[in-house]
Each structure stands twice: as structure tokens, then as C-alpha cells.
Amino acid sequence: MTRMSTGIQVVDDLLGGGIRTGALNLVYGAPGVGKTSLCMSIALGLCDEEGSVVVLDTENGWSETRLAGVCEAVGKPGRDKSVKVYRSGTMAEQHRIASKIIEEDIESNDWAPRAIVMDSAVAHYHASLLGTPAGFLASKARELQGRLSVQVNSLVRLASSYNSVLMATSWLKSGVGEKMSEKKIIEVALQAKQEKPVGDVEGAFGAVGYGLIGGQHIAYMAKSIIRMSATKLRHDVKALVLEKCVDAATARVVFVQLDQRGVTSYGEPKVLPMSEAIAVVLGELK
């Protein structure tokens, strides 16, 4: 694995000197926060004249018009022609494309993928769970997480073979999930008071996990996890919070803005500890 520049200096700095190739780099956040724009900007930043970008688009966010507009704005007109977009309407289609078709097409067309993007990894996963009766949710979730793991493993192997950057997006867990976690902590604490065996040690200590949808296996596999959040600085200014990284300290933040160029640095391009980043927002609000 090597590291490559994302084309956004402040993001390179956040990740400790660039984004890892041959490994899963995960971005998650609330709907509409800019995850697709971030992936698009990084992918186009990685793509040179000889390379290509392969995208598995499950949410119809990678439109030809949008791609062409970003390429024009960043001074790379026509580079959108190097982006190969696959679209899936079901989990079964997503599985087939991720685990088989992309690899076959790369080999048969002699593409040189600089980036592989799965945006998002969890749209069909979430939709499938919503349609499952409550009594079968646990078993259905395990089944879907298993399929998702196979897909991610296939793409990691592919990215490793071509020394490509692999990015995937996920969604933020709902408030219902947070309430369930709070209830679990209370139950575990009660078990401890009654001197019963405590199996969930993390729950007993109130440990905070990753707030993303898709199961813990995705979090385990990822070499970097960025949570993207809206801020009160401006509607187009977002915070990128580094929650996991093998190359850099976590709980650090950079601010970026969304415009016609996709994602660019906001203000002074500087990596901040979480406490300082929060202070910046509070200072702007006064």
C-alpha cells in the first residue's frame, strides 16, 4: 500500500500525507452532507490522462452533467469521459457488479483504475432491512452484512491489484439506534450491579462506536474513516472528522466547502484538534 494525493491539500494533511491505495477508505455522514462531492473531487484529483475511475453508484448521484461541470470547474475538461459509472437498483445487482462485473470489465477493457468508488455501500442494505418484519431483522442484517463484506473484500482485492484508491460511503445511524445503545448501557450496568456476568464490556464502559450503517465489519476493514458533518459556519461549509486512520492521529478536524469545483479547503487550510475545531465554530457564531 502506498499513499496518493487527493488533490485537496487539507485532506492530504488530515490523512497524514495522502490517501491509502489498496485499502478501504470510508466516508459517512447524514444525507446531503456532501459525501458524493468529496468522493468525486478526490477521484478526479487522482485520475490522470492515462487512468480511469470506476464508480458503483447506488443512489444516482454521479450524473454526467454533474461530473462534466466539476471537471470543467477544476480545469480538467473532458476528464469525465474517464469515469466509468455502474448503477444498481437492488442489493443483488450491487453484489454482482462489485464482486464480478467490475473486475471483468477492467481486465477486458484494459483500464488502469486510479480510483474505485462505492457510493453508497449501504443504500440497498438499508432498504432491505426496512422491508423486513421485526422478528427477522437480526438474521436479515447478518445475511446482508455478509454479502456486503464479500463485496468490500472483492473491491479491496481489486484495488490492491491495481494500486488503486478504494472509497466507499455509508450513512449516519438514526437517533433510534442511539436510544437503543443508551438502553443497552443501562441494562449492562444493572447486570454489573447484580454481579451477573457482563459479556458486553464496551457497553459496560459506555464506549462509543462508529455511528455508521452497514455493520462493524466495514469499520474493521477500513484503514481510514472520515465522518462528514454540516456546520453552522455556513451552509456550504462542512467538517471532516478523522475517526480512524493508520497513518495519522484521530479526533482531528478540517473544514472544507462545497462549490462548483466539488470540495475545496475553507479558510486557513489547517488540521485542528476536535476541541479547537468546535471553538472555531462557536467563535464564528458569537
Briefly describe each language-model feature range.
Residues 1-79, 283-285:
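The Walker A/P-loop phosphate-binding site
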Residues 5-8, 12, 21, 64, ...:
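Amphipathic alpha-helical transducer elements in NTP-driven molecular machines
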Residues 11, 27, 67, 83, ...:
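Conserved RecA-like P-loop NTPase ATPase core
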Residues 17-19, 45-49, 75-78, 104-111, ...:
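Conserved catalytic network of the ASCE P-loop NTPase/AAA+ motor domain
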Residues 25-27, 54-56, 84-86, 167, ...:
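Hydrophobic/aromatic beta-strand patches that form the interior of the parallel beta-sheet core
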Residues 50-140:
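Conserved inter-motif catalytic segment of the P-loop NTP-binding fold
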Residues 115-120, 124-137, 141-169, 176:
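Aromatic-anchored, glycine/proline-accented short structural segments
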Residues 146, 153, 157-280:
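Phosphate-binding/switch region of NTP-binding enzymes
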